[in-house]
């Protein structure tokens, strides 16, 4: 007999203990680093460096604390059968309203688990936003906006989650052994639909998007024309992130006819035109090399693997009984919830692989910007320092957690590409 319960708990603890070990390595590195690293000693003052170290340490301590609490609450939820309790309560409610079928019962179960997750997360996100971020001058969010965001995001989660869940349960019960294939088709359809509706209907609920204009717009459109990006007032936007915090970012997303580049207003206000164009050159690099599509394909491989493995275990009564449920006839949603605990090591492996490709894509986008004639990394340093970004990372910690290369890795890569560019264009 396979003891799924012991395997799941062991994997869960192993993953978190390794994460704690990496946090310890990173914390020790930060503690021992008292002087500005050589690669940026002429770019940052000792005072700003010290503040950066304090911010990095505060975030790391926060991460360690929240992970510790997550481990304890998860173990307690297994020791005291919280999930079976919610499942039985869901049946009672479904019977009271006269619809004790699996879909209605699963919708109640989903609502309970989402509700508990949202409520227990609020103190941590509040602390992070209004204490940690406030301490270092980044918080600009009001408590009213904080509450509004939580309400809207929860309603969206339930509003979209319940219909998708109901459809998924129907498909799984209908499709039998081929459930992995039909569920994958459903997820592909949902992904493509979300890419279409997210920028138009979802994002405006949280932020205001203004088309880029003026001299900056003319320069960006000229650069876009050089690289073949279909730029217009409907594809490049400035978002009012400053109403939430002082952080800066730019990102490209979308496929087919929904391609967009978004610049934070904090970024536009902080960088000069040439630096902003260098940022745009990087984002255009993601577009030209189809990084969004490639990442989406990687995610599909992950999903197919997950769904196929789930199809092999969904009818195994041992999986359910070892976690306090009656049998595999309980629910598709219960089976998926339990399976995700068991699947966590494979999920982590895929996350690491996706990080490897993501880091590679960042280097490629930087290379593309160099080929456009942006021959330094000043904008990266400026952004990093304004963000009080960590200046040194333990290599194991970075490889495990980061989807982007570190500042020194990107800077060194750009310097090498600039040298080659200058040789080629003498």
UniProtKB/Swiss-Prot annotation:
Q: What is this protein called?
A: CAAX prenyl protease 1 homolog
Alphabetized, the UniProt keywords read: Endoplasmic reticulum, Hydrolase, Membrane, Metal-binding, Metalloprotease, Protease, Transmembrane, Transmembrane helix, Zinc
Instruction: Say if the entry is tagged with keyword Transmembrane.
Output: yes
The source organism is: Dictyostelium discoideum (Social amoeba)
Where, by residue number, does the polypeptide cross the bilayer?
4-24, 71-91, 107-127, 151-171, 179-199, 295-315, 334-354
Q: Is Zinc among this UniProt entry's keywords?
A: yes
Location comes to: Endoplasmic reticulum membrane
Quote a single Gene Ontology cellular component term: endoplasmic reticulum membrane
